Amino acid sequence: MTIAVGRAPSRGWFDVLDDWLKRDRFVFVGWSGILLFPCAFLALGGWLTGTTFVTSWYTHGLASSYLEGANFLTVAVSSPADSMGHSLLLLWGPEAQGDLTRWFQLGGLWPFVALHGAFGLIGFMLRQFEIARLVGIRPYNALAFSAPIAVFVSVFLMYPLGQSSWFFAPSFGVAAIFRFLLFLQGFHNWTLNPFHMMGVAGVLGGALLCAIHGATVENTLFEDGEGANTFRAFNPTQSEETYSMVTANRFWSQIFGIAFSNKRWLHFFMLFVPVTGLWMSAVGIVGLALNLRAYDFVSQELRAAEDPEFETFYTKNILLNEGIRAWMAPQDQPHEKFVFPEEVLPRGNAL
């Protein structure tokens, strides 16, 4: 027997910190937690502060806080004024100059919440990568979570960066998001954009697949227990499978004539559909940031302008979009002092 005698390698501060971050505890921290927890705390705290106390009078001419009488559906952390451009509006920057009240008035909370929120979401994705590596599984959860991150970054950051200022980004609130949706439709005809169509197909298709999958598994359970209902019938730690893939395959083969042949392909498809849809919608929003057009059926517009009896759903939607632009712009951008004479407002079938 050989005995090797030597000195244990010294552990530096990095090794000690690595052990502490990855220690098994109720809430795992990890290296990703250094980014996730502070950013998530500051983003959520900034949003709660803004919706509780901070007005949007100086940026949008609106009341947007509980203090002013708004409710949960109408409060918001509003985007900065158009005149601020793409400034980060740092508290110590030239705009606020360290004055917290002035910073609130200028809309400084919006870039604060947007940037910390984006980095918080990225930190959560990295958390899934990190834990997957430690547990020894594939990182597809992190890959899936990249889709909502792409949508958030494209809508809240890429779109306003392509426009004249942060003002045109959605404010952080329920009714504020609805206003932004109307804006996208009126100024970009977003619902006719093929990337939006792919996004809708992905989200609704993912919901459909989720419902079908859950129902099929429930339908093909073959090992029941003594519980009064499905939710009480199983031991949550049982190792064996309790539903029949073969029976499910036979059922859907009779319904559609085709069915998934194995679970890997089935679950990959359930991952692929919503993730691809969200990614495509994010690509479409980046296109809107650059003011790219999708489908413009000019021939129908010209014919509708010449022939009062010719109208399609497309030309009708174009008129509705013109109405949104004409009536929304003065309300949405009061600082521009838009005035639309009566004769230029859309009326009837005339484009």
Curated annotation (Swiss-Prot):
Which positions bind chlorophyll a ChlzD2? 116
Kindly give the InterPro entries that the UniProt entry links to this protein. Answer: D1/D2 (IPR055266), Photo_II_D1/D2_sf (IPR036854), Photo_RC_L/M (IPR000484), Photo_RC_L/M_CS (IPR055265), PSII_PsbD/D2 (IPR005868)
Its Gene Ontology biological processes? photosynthetic electron transport in photosystem II
First-tier enzyme category under EC: oxidoreductase
**Catalytically driven reaction(s):** 2 a plastoquinone + 4 hnu + 2 H2O = 2 a plastoquinol + O2
Give yes or no: UniProt keyword Magnesium.
Answer: yes
Q: Which residues bind Fe cation?
A: 213, 267
Where is a plastoquinone bound in this sequence? Answer: 213, 260
Record's bilayer topology term: Multi-pass membrane protein
Transmembrane residue ranges? 39-59, 123-139, 151-164, 206-226, 277-293
Entry's EC annotation: 1.10.3.9
Q: What are the coiled-coil residue ranges?
A: none
According to its UniProt record, where is this protein mainly located? membrane
Which UniProt keywords are given for this protein, alphabetically ordered?
A: Chlorophyll, Chromophore, Electron transport, Iron, Magnesium, Membrane, Metal-binding, Oxidoreductase, Photosynthesis, Photosystem II, Thylakoid, Transmembrane, Transmembrane helix, Transport
Quote the PANTHER family the UniProt record gives: PHOTOSYSTEM II D2 PROTEIN, PHOTOSYSTEM II PROTEIN D1
Recorded protein name is Photosystem II D2 protein
Q: Which gene encodes it?
A: psbD1
